[in-house]
Swiss-Prot record:
It is found in: Cytoplasm. GO terms for biological process: regulation of DNA-templated transcription. This is Probable transcriptional regulatory protein ACIAD2052. It comes from Acinetobacter baylyi (strain ATCC 33305 / BD413 / ADP1). Belongs to the TACO1 family. One of its GO terms (cellular component) is cytosol. One of its GO terms (molecular function) is DNA binding. Transmembrane segments: none annotated. The keyword Transcription applies. Keywords: Cytoplasm, DNA-binding, Transcription, Transcription regulation. It comes from the Bacteria. The keyword Lipid biosynthesis does not apply. Coiled coil: none annotated.
């Protein structure tokens, strides 16, 4: 169980996420529609759908809205032209960036994404330019470290790959395939996670110690997340403690 401190950076990113309910709802609806289209309307057998439904409920999206989105996806309504496209590039300081989008118009999305990179002194790259630096995996996080032993027992028995333990959190790591089974086992054991999702996790980190570069990275991420077509933004940035303190000031 190799632990590396990432909680401060993770929490800082979450604090910066888009606060607009309308934008958040739109992104979740698109993800629900696509998840239902690809894996079916039954959340019990569709881990991707189950994960996004839980996240949608956590931001107070109504069950009716969620069910309508599921039916749209499962029935193929208004969704034939919605495609998942991932863009890759670099921000300042050599920070690798993956941008996951869902779009019905590539002629709109490509220039919008490129603008976010160029406006913040980054560069949009070609397919494969940074994706090799990331691994797709499930992450299930808990803030209550007192549950360490129980979480470890249940998660490893259910097929988790690893568990990282820090002073302020526990992170259960799974393969994408076992994510649903591990999450179900933890829930059945009465262990409710604070966050659970399949993500692109960086294999190496690009540490930023300059506050101006850090501001540029944050601006780029915020600009990308503000785009309607963008679903997720992943980077390998790791801010130094000094930079984090200045960003939070």
């Amino acid at each position: 169980m190799a632990g590396h401190s990432k909680w401060a950076n993770t929490k800082h990113r979450k604090a910066k996420q888009d606060a607009s309910r309308a934008k958040v709802f739109t992104k979740y609806i698109r993800e629900i529609v696509t998840a239902a289209k690809l894996g079916g309307a039954d959340a019990a057998s569709n881990p991707r759908l189950r994960a996004v439904v839980e996240k949608a409920l956590s931001v107070n999206m109504t069950r009716d809205a969620i069910n309508r989105a599921i039916q749209r996806g499962a029935g193929g309504e208004d969704n034939d032209d919605l495609n998942e496209v991932t863009y890759e590039g670099y921000g300042v300081g050599g920070v690798a960036v993956l941008v996951e989008t869902m779009t019905d118009n590539l002629n709109r999305t490509v220039p919008d994404v490129r603008h976010c990179f160029s406006k913040t002194n980054g560069n949009l790259g070609t397919n494969g330019s940074v994706s090799y630096l990331f691994t797709k995996r499930g992450e299930i996080s808990f803030e209550d470290v007192s549950l360490e032993d129980k979480i470890m027992d249940v998660a490893l028995e259910a097929g988790a790959d690893d568990i990282e333990i820090e002073e302020d959190g526990i992170l259960v790591i799974t393969s994408p395939e076992s994510f649903g089974d591990v999450q179900d086992a933890l829930t059945a054991a009465g262990l409710k996670s604070d966050n659970a999702e399949v993500v692109m996790s960086p294999s190496t980190k690009a540490e930023i110690t300059d506050i101006e570069q850090a501001k540029q990275i944050m601006k780029m991420i915020d600009m990308l997340e503000d785009l309607d077509d963008v679903q997720n933004v992943y980077t390998n940035v790791e801010f130094s403690e000094e930079v984090l303190a200045q960003l939070d000031a």
